[in-house]
Amino acid sequence: MLGNFSYSNPTKLYFGEESLCSLNEELPKYGKTVQLIYGGGSIKKNGIYNQVMRLLKDNGKVVVEDGGVMPNPTVEKLREGVQIARENHVDFLLAVGGGSCCDYAKALSVSVHCDEDPWEKYYIRFEEPDCEIIPVGCVLTMVGTGSEMNGGAVITNHDQKLKIGHVFGDAVMPKFAILNPKFTFTLPKKQMVAGIYDIFNHICEQYFSGEDDNTSDYISEALMKSVIHSSRIAIQNPEDYEARSNIMWAATWALNTLVSRGKSTDWMVHMLGQAVGAYTDATHGMTLSAVSLPYYRYIMPYGLSKFCRFAVNVWEVNPAGKADEQVAREGLSCMEVWMKELGLTMNLHELGATEEMLHGIANGTIIMEGGYKVLNHDEVLEILKNSL
């Protein structure tokens, strides 16, 4: 049965082709100086930068630019952003980009007025903020992370070979998020499919736990089927508005905490993927796709009934006359076919990982509870070897 829970989400969402105009409604609520956060500069090529800047100026904002946010934003970049914000007495953080920009903005929001080293406080000791928090807004140009409607912020420390996420509370979540599916049309295919798999895996991580018949899992199955269907259209026609809008909307619901209500969750694929990312700096979604199937095939016997349900309800495997294990394996085989159809990375070797790295990656993998099997170090290492 569903466990006891409460649910709220403070982020206001604006969705659709005209959603950027909603900045006119939101910007007057916040202070004068805005730190504009973006990535490698693609928003300057596709015109989004000019649109955002015009709206900021129209609303009388002083804009301080903070570009160059990399995938898997680093602690060094975070410290650089803190310095920019402090020197300019920033009142508001506006992230224009994908999940890395949104994550960075949230990490920045709790670091600017923090007297301690944010890496140590939030990512090593996992403490909550006790300082002033700068409000954040997001204009999404790449989908996958769901960062626009949650409190998660992942930061990478290359010196320590660690990539760690901290899920902050409501006060850190974006005050608003603007989602225009057309802003995702110009993404390179690799980024698009990596984002699609990130969405799918977010749902899986919350789905593969518990055996109860609950509404949260039915919602997850519907979201997974929507992602599978729309992804097949999007890889053939990246400018299909209906497909891209459904993918964008599914990404938000996959990680705004809705589908985890009343149940435990299993985030081990993300823990493995983040540890891989700390060593390879590979695209996040591709680190997940490289380790997913070896992980799920390893834990399948411990959660056999849910894997059977996944096969039947999501992949439409016919269970008639088949043993449960066969049905479950067919479901994962269907998933593998779809992943290859998208062109996802299917092993760690493709990401540049070597056998010599595996012990370090295993040591950097945080062990999570909540799934069907709490792994030990040797099991983590075995799964990584099977992923190579």
Give short role names for the model-derived ranges.
Residues 90-106, 141-147, 279:
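Glycine/serine-rich anion-binding loops at beta->alpha junctions
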Residues 171, 314, 318-388:
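C-terminal charged capping/lid subdomain of soluble metabolic enzymes
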Residues 11, 114-212, 309:
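A glycine/threonine-rich phosphate-anchoring loop and its flanking beta-alpha core
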Residues 79-82, 101-115, 149-152:
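Short Gly/Thr/Asp-enriched flexible loops that form oxyanion-binding sites at enzyme active sites
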Residues 206-333:
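Active-site segments that bind and position negatively charged phosphate/pyrophosphate groups
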Residues 200-204, 244-255, 292, 335, ...:
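Short alpha-helical scaffolding segments that buttress acidic/His motifs in well-ordered protein cores
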Residues 1-92, 348:
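ATP/NTP phosphate-donor binding region
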